[in-house]
Amino acid sequence: MSIRATAATPGLLAYLRGINPAEHPALARLRERTAQHRMGKMAVAPEQAAVLAWLVRLTDAENYLEIGVFTGYSSTAVALALPEHGRVTACDINAAYTEYAREAWQEAGVAHKISLHLQPAIFTLDELLAAGRADSYDLAF
């Protein structure tokens, strides 16, 4: 299995690869590991995660909400792009899949930025609303 952007033309992919920084070593290892996973096709492509990271930098985002973590490629890429005080709220229901993510977050040195909620995202969203955090996110994916 390979992880690739399915809706991008070869020209667009070449452009994105040319303007984006090199893939972080922790992301490269996670991508390779995820590609071997039986559900590996669920992962975002490196170019998609790079666009998310670019949006973080472009908008000076500090708080990011992710619904559906899988093995953590996009959450790791975003956490790397966030400022040191930035935070990721990550929602998923599968502890086995997110174990890959936890390992990647540690390896990339961003685990301290990420709060993983292992329950249906609707419950986490309800909790965030009840805590008065309706307007606290700069970017969601």
Where are these regions (language model features)?
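A short alpha-helical cap/connector motif
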Residues: 1-141
